[in-house]
Amino acid sequence: MAELTSMKLNAESHLLLDQPLLRMPYELSRRNFKNAQRVIEHSSANMTTSLAAATKAASKSASPDATLDSLDAMISKMQVLKRKLEGLHEEETRIHKSAKARLRHLQDLYDVNSLVDVKYDEWSRTRLSRLLVDYLLREGYSESAAHLAQSKEIEDLVDVDAFIACHKIERSLREGMSTSLALDWCKEHSKELKKGGSMLEFELRLQQYIELVRQGGETKLVEARVHAKKYLSTSGDFELLRKAAGLLAYKPWDDVEPYVSLYSPSRWAHLANLFLSTHHNLYSLPPRPLLHIALSAGLSALKTPACHSAYTSSSANASSATTSVCPICSTELNELARNVPYAHHTKSIVKNDPVVLPNGRIYGRDQLTAFNKKVGTESGWVRDPVDGIKGEAWSESEVRKVYIM
């Protein structure tokens, strides 16, 4: 159809927003593989030691009971290893299932030829559900996100469990004022954090030092000095070390910078935000919700100077013909798009002899005539190509010519 040629789908440009969709399974699979490798290496070393001890005991004509005890200990260790590997295998299977579903979801877009195809509408609704789940997870509404993912049957396309674990650690910092969970996470990802030059673990150790000094007392101050020597002295940041040492001479209620800032409870919020940014960087997740990115791009692409003009905006004139046509002029989006920049248009493309239908849509007259002739619209009447043959028909006298100033 003639009207579909101008609505051809470019799958590559659509998938720019969906790059993180495959990064998370990849990072999870890589981490799971390293965990399995670590478990096997550790267990192999233990098994080798146990086997050598059992062989040595048997060669010295040890009692049968002692030999059996050694063998039972080895079997127990092997059973523990088996359970750990089975758990890691189940996790790997789940990750592969999720990755396969995501690849299938992205491949579905390449099977769509036009923006007006019903399949594209279905695919877009699935993506919108994904973006909403991502937004809810980032805002901490994990239960609502899980229910939405389940109702839309997109559990394999979203990372509910990963975000739940992330926010558990974040809340332990922001609300619980505890560094234990975050330090466990740092230990689990120590190689990646060290490679990326992350300061998260150092900041957490510094907070532990601050809390020891805050408690006061000779015992706690001695613990603080030992802690600083063990965890802080290797940082190489002598300016920060100088400030940390200065805490020993000041109390939490002393209004002296920079020590009052180090003692401030707001540092816990700083640590929580630092953990979130570190977590998202590690798993190649964008710092902002994907819904924000999609909305910003969409609002910018549709926004025109007329949308917020005091003279021409339909938001200021309820009787405007564009009120139900322009999304930016709608009551819901007009104020939201006020500070969004205009799209950068390098060229304008206008069909020859443009005309506007009563519903506000503009087409070239030749394109409109060709479509209505092809679908067999009654002479003297026209239909909107987007609505198709089931759409409303208007008299040609209602079609107005468009003039571009």
Swiss-Prot record:
Domain of life: Eukaryota
Main localization (coarse): cytoplasm
InterPro entries: CRA_dom (IPR013144), CTLH/CRA (IPR024964), CTLH_C (IPR006595), Fyv10_fam (IPR045098), LisH (IPR006594), ZF_RING_GID (IPR044063)
Zinc-finger ranges (RING-Gid-type): 326-387
GO biological process, one term: proteasome-mediated ubiquitin-dependent protein catabolic process
CC per GO annotation: cytoplasm; GID complex; nucleus
Domain LisH: 124-156
Domain CTLH: 162-220
Keyword annotations of the record: Cytoplasm, Metal-binding, Nucleus, Zinc, Zinc-finger
The protein, known as: Protein FYV10
